[in-house]
Amino acid sequence: MPCLHSYRSAVEQAGGTVLEVQYCDAQPDRAAAAMEAVMQKYPQGVDALLVTSDDMALAAIKCIWDNNSAAYQKTVICGFDGNQAAVEALDRGELTVDIAQQGYEMGYKAVEAALDALEGKSVESVIDSGSEVITADNIDAYIADCREKGLWS
């Protein structure tokens, strides 16, 4: 898994240690169960959680809050997708950072590529739709952009 390899490399280069990886198949209920297990195994807390989907990150956050876990209140939690519920959690201070995978751009560029292919034009084998790191510093601009594109109400 390229994402896992790059994650491990970045953590190690920063002087950190990956304690473990929990595979949850993008299922929030499995993420909640995994979070329960992590909290039992590491009752003192962990520094950070990298969760590969926003729905799973929100399930982990709910688990922390439901268990009133003081040891995990300061854990840096990173989600992926940039969906509205996760960005709202970031705005409330529950999620620390979110990586938006730019679904709008993915869809737009996919249609452009399909139209080019239908017209007999060459299409790049890799089309980068970008990603955006969302934090408390740029959340307002991200929300405004989503609303401007009609993605959020």
How does the language model describe each region?
Residues 1-3:
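Glycine- and acidic-residue-enriched helix-capping/strand-helix junction motifs
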Residues 5-7, 19-20, 25-88:
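Hydrophobic alpha-helical
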Residues 9-11, 102-153:
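Hinge/cleft segment of the Venus flytrap/periplasmic-binding protein
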Residues 14-17, 73-74, 94:
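A short helix-to-beta-strand connector/capping loop
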Residues 18-21, 77, 98, 126, ...:
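Conserved beta-strand scaffold positions in the cores of enzyme catalytic domains, especially
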Residues 21, 92-104:
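Short beta-strand elements at the ligand-binding edges of bilobed clamshell
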Residues 59, 81-85, 93-94, 105-109, ...:
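Short amphipathic alpha-helical segments
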